């Protein structure tokens, strides 16, 4: 691949990585990040920001559509825990170990859908699970799924929270589908094992109960 260690120095390894990237994308191979190469490097981030025609889609349906648009570009951390251009996009420029970005991702996607439909956000754009849970509870939008009967109200496009303690939450994502008490989700700051401190946006399968 084209990956190399991010150390803040444009050295020989970075130059070779740029040359590989240019070759793979059928650009002039120079090892120099010119404007054409920069545009190609940033194209995945540009792609997730393209507007989706809403048609007759509801806010929930459009939220799922935007989440899939992000998933297709496979956003990942680069240069350390909770670091890189994707994290900065979702976190309004913030990055670093102290900035988990699952909430930033979920509410950034929700905001995209709201702006497309020109409607107010049902939840604030936020960086913390606890603050989102508190806002949802105050607005009487926090649904507790302790029994199978509770799941009848859950729809694709909803945000879900993973509980840490009785009074706090540690992770959030977007419900893509729900079938037979099982959620298919699209989440940021996770990985295939379901970590709340993962490194990517990915699709996961989770129990729908006790969320």
What do these predicted regions represent?
Residues 18, 102, 106, 157:
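Terminal peptide-recognition signature
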Residues 198-211:
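Low-complexity, Gly/Ser/Thr/Pro-rich intrinsically disordered linker/tail segments
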Residues 8-13, 31-35, 57-61, 96-104, ...:
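Soluble non-cytosolic domains of exported or imported proteins
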Residues 38-119:
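N-terminal capping segments
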Residues 1-43:
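Short acidic, glycine/serine/threonine-rich helix-capping segments at coil-helix boundaries
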Residues 13, 57-64, 116-195:
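...with weaker cross-activation on analogous glycine-rich loops/strands in unrelated enzymes
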């Amino acid at each position: 691949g084209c990956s190399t260690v991010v150390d803040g120095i444009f050295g020989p390894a970075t130059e070779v990585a740029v040359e590989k990237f240019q070759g793979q994308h059928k650009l002039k191979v120079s090892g120099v990040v010119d404007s054409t190469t920069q545009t190609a490097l940033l194209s995945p981030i540009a792609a997730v920001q393209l507007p989706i025609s809403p048609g007759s889609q509801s806010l929930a349906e459009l939220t799922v559509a935007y989440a899939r648009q992000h998933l297709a570009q496979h956003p990942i951390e680069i240069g350390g825990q909770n670091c890189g251009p994707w994290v900065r996009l979702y976190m309004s420029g913030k990055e670093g170990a102290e900035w988990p970005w699952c909430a930033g991702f979920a509410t950034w996607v929700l905001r995209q859908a709201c702006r497309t439909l020109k409607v107010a956000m049902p939840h604030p754009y936020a960086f913390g699970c606890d603050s989102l849970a508190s806002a949802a509870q105050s607005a009487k939008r926090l649904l507790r799924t302790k029994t199978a009967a509770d799941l009848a109200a859950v729809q694709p496009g909803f945000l879900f929270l993973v509980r840490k303690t009785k009074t706090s939450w540690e992770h959030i994502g977007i419900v893509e589908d729900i079938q037979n008490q099982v959620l298919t989700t699209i989440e940021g700051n996770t990985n295939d094992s379901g970590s709340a401190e993962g490194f990517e946006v990915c699709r996961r399968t989770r129990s729908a109960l006790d969320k």
